[in-house]
Regions:
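N-terminal loops that bind phosphate or other acidic moieties
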Residues: 1-245
Length: 245
């Protein structure tokens, strides 16, 4: 399969919203380990907003408009930087233009590459900073490397790369967000944003192949409270020094 129709794209995005909502406990546990613990909830809010648009535009015929409307709804519902970043990733930095009734592998790869560029411009994150970029960057590179192949092969490669990037995030010290206050203590924990990014790419690959890979087990993340408890301790003098009460 080298192109997707409007309806296939719409159904694929709907499947992604379902995957994220179903895995809220997994994402919450990942974020609770070293962050605020609200990533899963925020993603579900965004995905519910996306679903409303995707269901409302069932009779549409412009893929570009579908992406754009979905991104706007997610950003409005989620709010803040996270809303802007994840709506940009989910919709590939959609821009309305000439109506698009079919999407080729080249179109999809270019859209996601532009989304990555916009996210990095917005947040200045690089691979290795323990953010969603750890999964998104290698996924986009895989899309570009396999763009001449079928959607099945291209998305399989992207999902694998996103997973490996998410796993690699465990090795990094966080450069952004609340987790950066943990410094080396964040090592060993995966980034929640990278986890969401992997789930989205995995669901797209599953949808195109007509298969279902198992959802990850929240318990596989390990002790979820350790990082959050460390960050919640009183901080005095040096804002990077966590002082136990």
């Amino acid at each position: 399969m080298n192109s997707l129709t409007y309806e296939q794209v719409r159904e694929m995005l709907l499947a992604c919203t379902e995957r994220i909502m179903r895995n809220e406990p997994y994402l919450t546990r990942a974020d609770a380990a070293i962050g605020d613990g609200d990533h899963g909830t925020g993603m579900v809010i965004g995905m519910k907003a996306a679903r409303e648009v995707l269901e409302k535009e069932a009779d549409g015929d412009d893929i570009g408009k579908l992406y754009s409307d979905t991104a706007k709804a997610m950003e409005t519902a989620m709010g803040g930087a996270s809303g802007m970043i994840f709506s940009t990733m989910f919709a590939g930095n959609a821009k309305e233009g000439a109506p698009m009734q079919e999407m080729s592998t080249e179109d999809f790869a270019a859209r996601m590459a532009e989304g990555l560029r916009a996210i990095q411009e917005l947040g200045h994150a690089q691979p290795g900073d323990k953010t969603m970029v750890d999964a998104l960057y290698p996924a986009v590179e895989a899309l570009k490397s396999h763009v001449s192949e079928s959607f099945e092969e291209m998305l399989d490669a992207a999902a694998k790369a996103a997973y490996e990037g998410m796993e690699a995030s465990k090795k990094y010290v966080a450069k952004f967000g609340r987790a950066k206050n943990l410094m080396e203590r964040a090592i060993g924990h995966q980034d929640a944003g990278a986890s969401s990014t992997w789930l989205i790419f995995q669901e797209m690959a599953d949808f195109i192949r007509g298969e279902k890979t198992p959802d990850p087990d929240p318990e596989s993340i390990g002790e979820a409270k350790r990082g959050a408890e460390l960050v919640s301790k009183k901080i005095i003098n040096d804002p990077l020094e966590v002082v136990k009460e």
